[in-house]
Swiss-Prot record:
This is Pigment-dispersing hormone A peptides. Pfam families: Pigment_DH. It comes from Faxonius limosus. Keywords: Amidation, Cleavage on pair of basic residues, Hormone, Neurotransmitter, Secreted, Signal. Its main location: secreted.
Length: 76
């Protein structure tokens, strides 16, 4: 899904840049600024996904609500 979004953004940027060649200078600045914002948008999605990645055992323990002490006791 993410690759589809990147392709869509790239197609939109190509369309904007081909039309931008026909624009006057102030309009070209606006288009360049919008393209830069669109280009930075997919990178910001990764920061919304969550914090650090967890191992499967950490995910299971957090879902089950097991205390960390019990988790460490099982490893000994």
């Amino acid at each position: 899904m993410r690759s589809a979004m990147v392709v869509l953004v790239l197609v939109a940027m190509v369309a904007v840049f081909t039309r931008a060649q026909e624009l006057k200078y102030p309009e070209r600045e606006v288009v360049a600024e919008l393209a830069a914002q669109i280009y930075g948008w997919p990178g910001s999605l990764g920061t919304m996904a969550g914090g650090p990645h967890k191992r499967n055992s950490e995910l299971i323990n957090s879902i089950l609500g097991l205390p960390k002490v019990m988790n460490e006791a099982g490893r000994r």
